[in-house]
Amino acid sequence: MSSGTNKIVESIKSEAQEKADKIIQDAQAEIATINSDAEKTAEAEKNKILDNGKKQSDMKYQQIISEAKMNARRAELGAKEEVIEAAFAKATEDLKAKASSDDAEYSESLIKMIEEATEELGGGDLIVQVKESDVAKVEGHLKKLSADLATKTGVSTTLVLGEPIDAIGGAILKTRNGDIEVNNTIESRLDRFKGLLRSEVANVLFKN
């Protein structure tokens, strides 16, 4: 190979080497950039995952705490309800015992319940129903009650005993034709006032 040819070949090889070096250099720079970007992306993703994980963990924690509080509240309300129901059951038993005796206070209350029911009906010809053991407590009062209630209501009033009823105590009054009735038994009164009484009983039982 001539000297001129060698120079050309060497020049081509040198130029090719420079291009190769440049390509390699550029490639290495690109790889470094890719690696750097990948690391940043990976770090961001890692932080995102950790952040999401923390959020999910916090949410789960709050959910568990909320459920625990709700269950505790439910259990507390359930326990209070049991205590209140037990208090009502005890009160009912006490009333039953009082109404089954010759207790003067109950006899007075029974007459009062008949008066209230008569006034609610507006007087008139009414049938009075009480339990069998209470018949003797009221039959001697009906004539005077009729006169007193006629004055109160402004309507001619006659109270007569009807068939005995099955009740703890109290009375049921109704018109002669049975169209209108006022249930003033102890059971009915307890049911009517239970909502109000429940609140008062709860305040007394759980005031602390």
Curated annotation (Swiss-Prot):
Subcellular location per the Swiss-Prot or TrEMBL entry: Cell membrane
Domain of life: Archaea
The entry's keywords: ATP synthesis, Cell membrane, Hydrogen ion transport, Ion transport, Membrane, Transport
GO molecular function term, any single one: proton-transporting ATPase activity, rotational mechanism
Membrane-topology annotation of the record: Peripheral membrane protein
GO biological process annotation, one example: proton motive force-driven plasma membrane ATP synthesis
InterPro entries found in the cross-reference section: ATPase_E_C, ATPase_V1_Esu
Signal sequence, start to end: none
Region (Disordered): 37-57
Main location, first listed in the record: membrane
Subunit structure: Has multiple subunits with at least A(3), B(3), C, D, E, F, H, I and proteolipid K(x).
Family to which this protein belongs: Belongs to the V-ATPase E subunit family.
Function: Component of the A-type ATP synthase that produces ATP from ADP in the presence of a proton gradient across the membrane.
Protein name: A-type ATP synthase subunit E
Natural source organism: Methanobrevibacter smithii (strain ATCC 35061 / DSM 861 / OCM 144 / PS)
